[in-house]
Amino acid sequence: MDLRLMGFDHPLFHHIMDYAGDDKSSNSSAPSRTFMLDAKAMAATPADVKEYPNSYVFIIDMPGLKSGDIKVQVDGDNVLSISGERKREAEEKEGAKYVRMERRVGKLMRKFVLPENANKEKITAVCQDGVLTVTVENVPPPEPKKPRTIEVKIG
């Protein structure tokens, strides 16, 4: 169990967990540490999804991230992946120390399976005031074919 997921973020716990992670005899069917961290990042990243007649809009909170820190990708399986990472400021002023650390740091991630009518070539992403808006246009439905009339001849 990763104690960092439960709020124990002291360097001593990091050392203990890193040491425990070196055990090569662990159960191979257990979820990997990366999977668990990704699952936590996905659960902690709120998102709204809207369906319009011509598009789908994904609205995701990405607080504290610049547009260059956010990655939006679509893979071959129609999966839209949105990720970024917010890091703690490395610089500390002389004599200053944190009394309380409540702002979330770490990985932000969401994955969505796009519907078949999503146009993977027409995706836009705009980040403003810590909110990312990803718009995926729909492929227009095919025009219904008119029935062909066949002339009946007298034989």
From Swiss-Prot:
Induction cue: By photoperiod, by light treatment of dark-grown seedlings, and by heat shock.
First-listed, main subcellular location of the protein, grouped into a coarse class: cytoplasm
Keywords, ordered alphabetically: Cytoplasm, Stress response
Localisation: Cytoplasm
Keyword Cytoplasm belongs to the record: yes
Matches recorded under InterPro entries: A-crystallin/Hsp20_dom, HSP20-like_chaperone, Small_HSP
sHSP domain segment(s): 38-153
A GO-annotated cellular component: cytoplasm
Protein's UniProt keywords contain Cell membrane: no
Similarity section: Belongs to the small heat shock protein (HSP20) family.
Protein name (record): 17.2 kDa class II heat shock protein
Organism encoding this protein: Ipomoea nil
